[in-house]
Amino acid sequence: AAEVLIDPNTFSEDGTFSLGGTSISPDGKLIAYAVSDGGSDWRTWYVMDIASRELLPDVIEWSKFSGAVWAKDNSGFYYQRYDTPEEELLVDINEQPKLMFHTLGTNQIDDTIIYENPAQPRWGWSISISENNAYKILSISDGTEEKNRVYIQTTDSNEFLPVIDELIGEFKTTETRGRRVRVVTRL
């Protein structure tokens, strides 16, 4: 029989908290889920053991416009975060996001910066990991335009290299085979 894993109705008594995203670990044992307060774009991520329904101590704050993308070895996940707002939580302009990696069982303050670009404060990104774990692929956008850049990092490099470095269309990676990456475009 079907069971409810996460019930957003239990997040708050007044119903102002909502489910902002979910991501199940590759082994199917954990789920990262995001909670939003009052319709805000800000997300707080939590991690739950699916079998026991117990929350792990991992809490990720100041995430926005981001999913959680698990490492293939289930050790943690990637997410986009912003610096903690100084004053007006819902008014301050948020710039200079960082792509972070959170290792399960550690404090968010110890998360690793995977990518940032202070010269481009409006850029945002999403990451995908190739099935063979050979590539990390960044899709980089500027604002809400439906065009993106594509950067790739190989397992033998710490640097993301631009593959498509202009906003000339929409590019989505669909699969990898060996050293080849298939990209679908909409120009």
Which ranges hold each PLM region?
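The structured alpha-helical core of multi-pass membrane proteins
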Residues: 55, 73-74, 101
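A flexible loop/linker signature enriched in serine peptidases of the S9 family
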Residues: 11-17, 35-44, 59-64, 80-98, ...
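Preference for long, solvent-exposed alpha-helical segments and helix-linker "stalks"
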Residues: 106-108, 114, 128-130
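A short beta-strand motif characteristic of beta-propeller blades
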Residues: 4-13, 54-59, 112-116, 159-164
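Acidic/His-leaning functional-site neighborhoods
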Residues: 149-150, 167
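Well-ordered mid-protein domain cores that form the structural environment of catalytic cofactors
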Residues: 1-54
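Conserved beta-propeller blade repeats
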Residues: 13-34, 61-80, 119-139, 159-162, ...
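Short loop/turn segments that connect beta-strands within beta-propeller blades
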Residues: 49-53, 103-107, 154-158
